[in-house]
């Protein structure tokens, strides 16, 4: 499924119309929009988006999730996974079915993250696990998936410690992004609170359904950036040789060269 993802949008106060059926168009893709919304609002909406004209048309939405601010679709587009970004124990990860024929979103199930304010969610390369970065919890939660794509309850919580320069915003770890490297061999976790990128090798002996088998936690190492930076999101160049980190506190972008889990800073952009 070709898709575009938008997250963290403010929900529209206007009532949405009924789902729209549009004529097939080779330029058309699905646009998924997450937002900060109450459970009685459509926190996630799906639109048809025309890449050529930039026009979009509302298809459908789903209620029942508090603050689904970040989401990710499966490779085939049949499942969508989203955070429920609440501050405390009510924080969740959520599995959604997307029926493209019926243009309908259906909540499959929800599981607690055990870490407050999950702000990022991703699928493992095998799509057998879902992971969340928990901002206020200072942690990562690993969820195994069952054969239907639902989140299983046997989770693994990976917690962090530390702080950094900013006395208001960096008094504790704040996990903001988790990204598997293009070679699928490492997980990178940017930590706004400690000015680090935590790096976990992906296990070569992953057991389906066993959350603690995904990452080699004992081999974790950290990449330190300038104090007071506040790492937020990281992405890779299509050639897989470079990565780029945006920093929320300093406002700088750091360019890295990448090789076998190692990131070497080559440029700081103001």
Segments the model singles out, each with a brief description of its role:
Residues 36-38, 85-87, 135, 145, ...:
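Short loop/turn segments immediately following the C-termini of beta-strands
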Residues 40, 65-76, 114-125, 129, ...:
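Beta-rich, blade/repeat-based domains predominating
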Residues 58-127:
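Blade-loop segments of beta-propeller domains
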């Amino acid at each position: 499924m070709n898709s575009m993802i938008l997250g963290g949008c403010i929900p529209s106060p206007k009532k949405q119309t009924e789902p729209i059926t549009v004529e097939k168009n080779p330029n058309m893709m699905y646009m998924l929009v997450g937002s900060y919304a109450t459970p009685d609002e459509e926190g996630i909406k799906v639109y048809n988006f025309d890449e050529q004209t930039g026009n979009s048309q509302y298809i459908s939405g789903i209620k029942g999730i508090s603050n689904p601010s970040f989401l990710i679709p499966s490779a085939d587009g049949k499942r969508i996974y989203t955070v429920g970004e609440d501050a405390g124990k009510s924080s969740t990860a959520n599995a959604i079915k997307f029926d493209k024929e019926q243009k309908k979103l259906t909540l499959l199930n929800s599981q607690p993250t055990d870490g407050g304010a999950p702000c990022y969610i991703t699928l493992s390369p095998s799509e057998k696990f879902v992971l969340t970065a928990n901002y206020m919890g200072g942690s990562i939660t690993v969820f195994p998936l069952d054969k239907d794509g639902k989140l299983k309850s046997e989770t693994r919580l990976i917690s962090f410690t530390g702080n950094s320069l900013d006395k208001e915003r960096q008094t504790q770890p704040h996990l903001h992004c988790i990204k598997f490297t293009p070679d699928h061999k490492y997980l990178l976790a940017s930590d706004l609170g400690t000015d680090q990128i935590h790096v976990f090798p992906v296990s070569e002996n992953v057991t389906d359904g066993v959350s603690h088998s995904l990452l080699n936690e004992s081999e974790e190492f950290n990449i330190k950036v300038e104090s007071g930076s506040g790492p937020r999101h990281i992405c890779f160049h299509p050639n897989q040789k470079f990565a780029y980190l945006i920093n929320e506190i300093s406002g700088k972008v750091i360019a890295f060269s990448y090789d076998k889990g190692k990131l070497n800073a080559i440029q700081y952009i103001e």
